[in-house]
Amino acid sequence: KIVAERRTAPPSATSALVAKAVAFLQANYTDPNLTVGSLAKYTYTSREHLSRAFKTYTMESVHGYLTNLRMQHCRRAIAAGASVLDACNASGFTNYTSFLKTFRSLYGITPSEYRNQLRRTPERVHSTP
């Protein structure tokens, strides 16, 4: 019975804040000017409070979540045939060198190596890193 009550309880203000932040990030992650500060302004809260609440509910930092959204977009763009630079720019990254380092750090290969893997094994597009 306690579990049933917990499921029907209205969301807390903090979880609503995080849900609003996640929805905004998902809708605007390609904006190169999107920052934790601009997200905090959008949600009418401080950067510190937003960062703490976000990490508590998602187990990930705002920056990490945004980076992952952008990387997923970039991988889809590369798989669709975009150049690495175009995929980087279309994904909201502002620094190409930083993007390359982050991609390699997350996936263990460069974006060009990823593209080459896709060309060799197109049936693995959705199962690659």
What are the functions of these language-model segments?
Residues K1-A9, A13-A16, K20-A23, K41, ...:
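An amphipathic alpha-helical interaction segment
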Residues K1-R7, K20-L34, F54, T58, ...:
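Basic, amphipathic alpha-helical hairpins
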Residues P11-S15, N33, G81, F93:
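Short, solvent-exposed loop/helix junctions and linker helices
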Residues A13-A16, F99, T128:
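Compositionally biased regions
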Residues L66-R75, E113-S127:
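Short, basic, alpha-helical segments at the C-terminal edge of helix-turn-helix-like DNA-binding modules
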